[in-house]
């Protein structure tokens, strides 16, 4: 139904967005360079947020209707499970559902902040990293609540790979490791502000090699 598919699409978009944020060199030629990778990262993040809102409405709407006696959502008792893995996942449904709403609200706030042009970059740099923590919470939410039958189809392994790679990317972000191997040392030798286009030009002299960069 809409609830499950919106959740899958949202997590898929967010996972790919985080994978792109890792700045994997081999992806740059395929995606047209780092600037286009980040543009895709941005729009996948926005897509993940929009579909997450749809997912949230799909979850809340039946309860809203039930509150006015328009419809009563069926809540059949879950059958007792003999599969040990499935039984464990069922015991985790409560915590997984409980973490969903706070993570969703945090996602909205952090993505909106990231899109505000007037929000200072020095704060954006710090708050944007919090999205990695939110993502990890949503991975737990998704792993536990995704339909067990999906794991037997191609969808399950695909989502597992995406979320595993996304989790690695989130952990690298939390540990401030993104782009570390590509950093170069240098000193600013001059700068010029262009008010017409609101661009600051900076001249820099490198004091170390810039991995992967070729002048010209």
Regions found by a protein language model. Give the residues of each.
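FNR-like FAD-binding dehydrogenase module
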Residues: 1-216
């Amino acid at each position: 139904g809409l609830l499950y598919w919106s959740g899958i699409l949202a997590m898929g978009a967010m996972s790919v967005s985080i994978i792109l944020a890792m700045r994997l060199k081999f992806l740059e030629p395929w995606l047209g360079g780092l600037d286009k990778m980040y543009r895709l990262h941005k729009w996948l993040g926005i897509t993940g947020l929009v579909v997450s809102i749809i997912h949230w409405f799909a979850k809340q709407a039946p309860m809203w209707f039930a509150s006015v006696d328009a419809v009563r959502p069926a809540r059949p008792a879950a059958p007792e499970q003999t599969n040990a893995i499935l039984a464990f996942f069922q015991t985790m449904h409560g915590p997984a559902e409980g973490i969903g709403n706070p993570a969703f609200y945090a996602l909205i706030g952090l993505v909106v902040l990231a899109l505000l042009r007037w929000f200072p970059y020095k704060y954006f740099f710090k708050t944007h990293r919090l999205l990695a923590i939110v993502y990890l919470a949503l991975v737990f939410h998704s792993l536990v609540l995704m339909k067990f039958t999906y794991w037997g189809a191609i969808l399950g392994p695909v989502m597992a790979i995406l979320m595993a790679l996304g989790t690695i990317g989130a952990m690298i972000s939390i540990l401030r490791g993104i782009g570390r191997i590509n950093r170069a040392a240098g000193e600013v030798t001059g700068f010029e502000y262009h008010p017409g286009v609101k661009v600051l030009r900076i001249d820099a002299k490198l004091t170390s090699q810039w991995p992967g960069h070729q002048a010209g």
